[in-house]
């Protein structure tokens, strides 16, 4: 007999809207046995009617992540095969249109596979398995990837803090095939990018900023560009190809800046007009302000400032401060491309924070474009939490 999770009265409403999370405080009782981490359980409303089938996670606040809302759909190898095929089909047009050899194949809940992220970099598939359900089905997931992508190596980068909330330890390593020498070279919009899936951030690279890199290129011809938190310099790379007069790439990582240099080289771009500055962005911006240095275009792509609600107020202060200083460094009519990758930072709140920064900077600001994650990072209508990357293009007077 299947284990049944009965919800408290009224807690079925979010599931009836197909939201895939059930929190521990919404559970009335567990019937039919004691589920182990990752086990598939049936979820029913307080009156007993069936709602969904999901993975049990006893140590997480999110105690069930729903795999399916279809009562006839079983969770087995065919289930994962179908989900992977559907995700690939949904990206095929984009891949052809933009000439992509690097893209997000599986975007977790937004692709109906909670806790599973898979990125493709040429012939390497990089997985992050971040939930007990994903962990339980690890071998099956890898088997299906090998069947559908027989020419690809499969590498795991489940080395993120969120696994701790599930009671899971970090896991990194090769799951199938042979890993090519690093870096892997991917291509997007005719630009080649070096990616180190072993030592790089996340799964190796920030695929979600692809459309925003192209957006930035519209504003840079003949301009001076300051690229903050540049990582491997790809905003600067797009700027160089688009004819920027000068580019300064700033990051704290020596390795990232070396890769930024390599990216220029593999695209046969001269970098005589590019400065690679290993520095703390927060300190450097203040230094440049004190020195009276200015730029025509500034890109602000900082790391996440808020991991939970208790950090949101502090994050707002951090975003306001850094945007204020950046505005003070822009020439009149200059362009600020500013981002937040904190899922808790709603787009309206982010715009308000940047508007407040403009007041403190004593600059007039016009918002001329909104930016978000690339379309291979879809947002399910039932899972608004999947909308995490927000950006604004602002003209600063």
UniProtKB/Swiss-Prot annotation:
Its EC number is 2.1.1.191. It comes from the Bacteria. InterPro entries: PUA, PUA-like_sf, PUA_sf, RLMI, RlmI-like_PUA, SAM-dep_methyl-trfase, SAM-dependent_MTases_sf. One of its GO terms (molecular function) is RNA binding. Its main location: cytoplasm. Residues 2-80 form the PUA domain. SMART domains: PUA. The keyword Nucleotide-binding does not apply. PANTHER family: RIBOSOMAL RNA LARGE SUBUNIT METHYLTRANSFERASE (PTHR42873), S-ADENOSYLMETHIONINE-DEPENDENT METHYLTRANSFERASE DOMAIN-CONTAINING PROTEIN (PTHR42873:SF1). Belongs to the methyltransferase superfamily. RlmI family. Specifically methylates the cytosine at position 1962 (m5C1962) of 23S rRNA. This is Ribosomal RNA large subunit methyltransferase I. It comes from Shewanella frigidimarina (strain NCIMB 400).
């Amino acid at each position: 007999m299947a284990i049944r999770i009965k919800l408290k009265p009224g807690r079925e409403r979010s599931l009836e809207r197909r939201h895939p999370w059930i929190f521990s405080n919404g559970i009335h009782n567990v019937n039919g046995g004691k589920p182990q981490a990752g086990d598939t359980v049936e979820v029913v409303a307080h009156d007993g009617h069936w709602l969904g089938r999901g993975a049990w996670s006893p140590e997480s606040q999110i105690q069930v992540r729903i795999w399916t809302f279809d009562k006839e759909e079983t969770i087995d190898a065919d289930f994962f095969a179908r989900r992977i095929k559907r995700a690939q089909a949904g990206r095929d047009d984009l891949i052809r249109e933009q000439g992509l050899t690097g893209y997000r194949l599986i975007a977790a809940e937004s692709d109906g596979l909670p806790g599973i992220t898979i990125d493709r970099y040429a012939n390497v598939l990089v997985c992050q398995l971040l939930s007990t359900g994903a962990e339980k089905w690890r071998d099956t997931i890898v088997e299906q990837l090998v069947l559908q992508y027989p020419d690809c190596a499969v590498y795991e980068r489940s080395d993120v803090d969120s696994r701790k909330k599930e009671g899971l330890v970090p896991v990194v390593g090769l799951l199938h095939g042979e890993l090519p020498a690093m870096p892997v070279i991917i291509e997007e919009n005719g630009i080649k990018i070096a990616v180190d899936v072993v030592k790089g951030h996340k799964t190796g690279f920030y695929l979600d900023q692809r459309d925003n890199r192209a957006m930035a290129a519209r504003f840079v011809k003949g301009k001076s560009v300051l690229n903050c938190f540049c990582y491997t310099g790809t905003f600067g790379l797009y700027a160089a190809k688009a004819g920027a007069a000068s580019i300064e790439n700033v990051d704290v990582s020596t390795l990232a800046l070396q890769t930024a240099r390599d990216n220029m080289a593999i695209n046969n771009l001269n970098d005589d007009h590019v400065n690679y500055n290993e520095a703390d962005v927060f300190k450097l911006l203040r230094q440049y302000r004190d020195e009276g240095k200015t730029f025509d275009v500034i890109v602000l792509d900082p790391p996440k400032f808020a991991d939970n609600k208790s950090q949101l107020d502090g994050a707002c202060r951090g975003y306001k401060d850094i945007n204020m200083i950046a505005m003070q460094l822009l020439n009149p009519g200059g362009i600020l491309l500013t981002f937040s990758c904190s899922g808790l930072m709603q787009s309206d709140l982010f715009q308000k924070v940047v508007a407040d920064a403009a007041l403190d900077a004593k600059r007039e600001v016009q918002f001329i474009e909104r930016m978000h994650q690339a379309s291979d990072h879809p947002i399910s209508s039932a899972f608004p939490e999947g909308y995490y990357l927000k950006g604004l293009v602002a003209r600063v007077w």
